[in-house]
A protein has these predicted regions:
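Extracytoplasmic cell-surface/polysaccharide-interacting catalytic and binding patches
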Residues: 2-273
């Protein structure tokens, strides 16, 4: 063998002793177990997080939708104030003697609708509370000036003219839904037409919504009452309007709701006492 061949051959690899081989094997085994356990921990963490996220949703499905229940109000300490402007009645029998000029504030930023300042503040609080319960309220009509009110009334009359009703009959039917300008309480700034995204139309279908259920239970706690209840047309002159709410102040609203009466009936009863 030549000298060049001997110098280019790689040196022989040093063989491990049994102890060295055994130690290396144990280290490799420990590393593999560590990786396996870390993977298991990651899987457990993912499963636990998923279960914790899913549990409240499953509970919600099993329990059903939240029930909105009104608080009990006995009215023992209620004091009726006939001079309270928030109780002002406006209807066909009690029309405006002068055009109102309420101090207004924006009640719903999304729609730009305004209410009387105190009513607007209470509406904002009410809408926020409803939102916290998963209910979105939409104020579609608040304060309206005389021209707006009259235009709405005339449009309603025209719908009955189009149905070939006489002028007298068209006016009479229109007034049960859309009062004439001088009998429409939207001029006070206390009237609020409230709807929801799932029922954006002013019709009795709103009475089947979660928003109406919420309002029926809690609106009085913010000073609002259902202005034209079902089966009260003889007293109010207006058909059932589940979207039309009226600000009267918290104590008044709680007392009126507890009585089960319309605003007209409640005021008449209080004045008779």
């Amino acid at each position: 063998m030549s000298e060049s061949t001997r110098t280019s051959r790689a040196p022989a690899e040093k063989r491990l002793t049994y102890q060295q081989w055994k130690r290396r094997k144990m280290l490799r085994l420990a590393r593999n177990w560590g990786l396996f356990l870390a993977g298991c921990a990651a899987v457990v963490a993912l499963l636990t997080g998923g279960i914790l996220w899913l549990l409240p949703k499953v509970h919600g499905l099993l329990a059903g939708p939240k029930v909105f229940a009104a608080s009990v109000y006995d009215g023992t300490d209620y004091v009726f104030d006939a001079a309270d402007a928030r109780l002002t009645l406006v209807n066909a029998n009690l029309p405006y003697t002068a055009e109102p000029a309420p101090l207004l504030d924006t009640a719903d930023e999304a729609t730009g609708q305004q209410l009387e300042a105190e009513a607007a503040m209470q509406y904002r609080s009410m809408a926020a509370a409803a939102q916290a319960d998963g209910v979105s309220l939409i104020l579609v009509a608040g304060y309206q000036d005389a021209d707006t009110r009259q235009a709405a009334y005339e449009a309603r009359v025209q719908t009955y003219r189009d149905k070939r009703k006489s002028e007298e009959e068209a006016a009479r039917l229109a007034a049960t839904i859309q009062p004439a300008a001088n009998a429409n309480e939207h001029g006070t700034g206390y009237a609020a037409d409230i709807l929801s995204a799932d029922n954006p139309q002013q019709d009795t279908g709103f009475a089947e919504t979660r928003a109406y259920e919420w309002l029926t239970a809690y609106a009085a706690e913010y000073g609002f009452i259902l202005r034209y209840p079902q089966d009260r047309q003889a007293a109010t002159g207006i058909v059932f309007e589940p979207w039309h709410w009226r600000y009267v102040g918290v104590e008044n609203a709680l007392a009126i709701r507890a009585s089960g009466l319309s605003l007209e009936e409640f005021i008449a009863l209080q004045r008779a006492d």
